[in-house]
Curated annotation (Swiss-Prot):
InterPro entries: Acyl_CoA_acyltransferase, GNAT_dom, Hisat_C. It comes from the Eukaryota. The gene is hisat. It holds the Pfam family Acetyltransf_1. Keywords: Acyltransferase, Transferase. The lineage of its organism: Eukaryota, Metazoa, Chordata, Craniata, Vertebrata. This is Histidine N-acetyltransferase. Enzyme responsible for the N-acetyl-histidine (NAH) synthesis, which is a major constituent of brain and lens of ectothermic vertebrates.
Length: 337
């Protein structure tokens, strides 16, 4: 059910009603004002410009704005997933001049009240973070799983030259097998995805806590979630259909506001075998940089113990620039009371 933009307010706790903020559902007309207060967010890797319109059209999602004196100062998106039991929080941003004043907490509480009033079956709030969790966070949240974050940048043209040195060029699967001793990975169609992820338990030990994390979004293994994922432009891959050890999802590249001709490539890697993870990583790079021209920020999420060796491979063998040291992507949740 889509909440209309008039937004019938839930009965708010007194602390929220006294916060001096006005809340509304975002519309297309708000886009420019939202982006004006979002400068430099997420290190220039903001996905909102490419997803804003589709978010507004998503029947399971509501994008909420907080205003102060009529000006947009914060945004948060909430999406109901997991068969209606989970409120997924995404896209949170607060205007620079309002940060550190508790605005994010007020907006999150408002969204929780709104979702509970509209979807009483929702039980938990889930979100994905990459900052350092402190003692207060552990009092509030349960950690569902974590992945290491490997962020790198390169020029697409330079990377293609390095890949060609290994015989990896163009969209050619057969060349990949000449560089890796294992058989080439299997790219899955929708039927194979359903079979592996929903109709068998073959991937339960590969996925962290039986959770699919796709571009910061954590999903339980449920048909309703798979329906959401299969609408997206994603390459799904495993090393072996009959006995998978490593699985990966690569979100198709999209432009980001870090600068002209900059793209973002997101790769979610699951499994503990370094050689197989590296093989699938190379395949995704080969496939998705073949037609790109310009700069690419590539972010790969992988099992934390694999991070160091994969980072060394990226730097020493592929000659890409590592943007930052080891950080973690943490999926956390709390009960909606």
């Amino acid at each position: 059910m889509k909440i209309d933009t008039s937004l019938n307010m839930p009965q708010l706790p007194e602390a929220l009603s006294q916060a001096g903020l006005q809340f509304s559902v975002a519309t297309e007309e708000d886009f420019d004002e939202i982006m004006a207060m979002s400068q430099d967010i997420y290190g220039g890797l903001d996905y909102l410009p490419t997803r804003y319109t589709s978010w507004l059209q998503d029947t399971n999602r509501t994008v909420i704005l907080a205003r102060k004196h009529g000006k947009v100062i914060a945004l948060e998106s909430v999406c109901v997933i997991d068969d209606g039991e989970t409120m997924l929080v995404e896209g949170l941003r607060v205007a620079p001049q309002e940060r550190g004043k508790g605005v994010a907490g007020v907006l999150l509480r408002f969204c929780a009240e709104l979702v509970k009033s509209r979807y009483p079956e929702v039980k938990v709030c889930r979100l994905t973070r990459d900052d350092q969790l402190g003692p207060k966070d552990f009092e509030k949240y349960r950690i569902i799983t974590k992945q290491g974050i490997l962020l790198m940048r390169f020029r697409a043209e330079d990377l293609k030259l390095h890949l060609s040195e290994f015989g990896l060029e163009g969209d050619n699967e057969s060349t990949l097998s000449t560089f890796c001793s294992s058989p080439p990975p299997v790219r899955l169609d929708h039927t194979a995805i359903q079979q592996l992820y929903l109709n068998s338990d073959l991937l339960h030990g590969v996925l962290p806590n039986a959770t699919i994390i796709q571009d910061w979004q954590p999903f339980k293994l449920l048909p309703s979630n798979m329906a959401i994922l299969l609408k997206k432009e994603i390459d799904w891959m495993v090393d072996d259909m009959s006995n998978p050890t490593v699985a990966s999802l690569c979100t198709f590249p999209f432009r980001v506001p870090i600068g002209d001709d900059w793209y973002y490539l997101n790769i979610d890697m699951f499994g503990k075998d370094l050689a197989l993870a590296r093989q699938q990583f190379l395949y995704h790079l080969q496939r998705h940089t073949a037609t790109l021209k310009g700069h690419v920020m590539c972010q790969m999420f992988l099992d934390p113990p694999l991070w160091k060796a994969m980072a060394e491979f990226c730097h020493n063998t592929l000659s890409v620039e590592l943007v930052k040291e080891y950080t973690e992507q943490c999926v956390v949740e709390c009960d909606l009371i």
